[in-house]
Regions:
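Alpha-helical substrate-recognition element adjacent to the catalytic core
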Residues: 2-113
Length: 115
């Protein structure tokens, strides 16, 4: 048996924080792990910016609900799962990923939780 592992953001769906940055009008939130590889430092920085603007999980989830998979992503996953086990491994949160997983046909995802 083979297992194929994929990232989520930038591979199957657009970058969540970039989408939220565009909707919220806060350009600083465009920063990703490509810009700041220290994940803990990046997340603390993001949380500080969210607090400064009075934003929280509900507003982020509202934006995520409007995000669609990249063109062909669901079809690609469907074909991949016909021949191998496909697992998404991501640094996103369960609370962010759930609506996206529904749109992708509920693939297996390993990620972190805010709980």
């Amino acid at each position: 048996m083979y297992i194929t592992c994929l990232d989520l953001e930038g591979v199957l769906v657009p970058e969540i924080w970039i989408a939220f940055s565009e909707v919220s009008g806060i350009p600083e939130l465009r920063r990703t792990t490509r810009d700041e590889p220290d994940y803990e430092k990046l997340m603390r920085w993001r949380m500080d910016i969210l607090r400064q603007h009075g934003l929280g999980l509900r507003q982020i989830q509202d934006v995520i609900a409007q995000i669609d998979p990249l063109p062909g992503a669901k079809e690609f996953l469907d074909e991949l799962r016909a021949t191998t086990q496909a697992v998404i491994v991501s640094d996103t949160f369960e609370e962010f990923a759930q609506p996206l997983m529904k749109k992708l046909g509920w693939p297996t995802i390993l990620c972190i939780s805010l709980a």
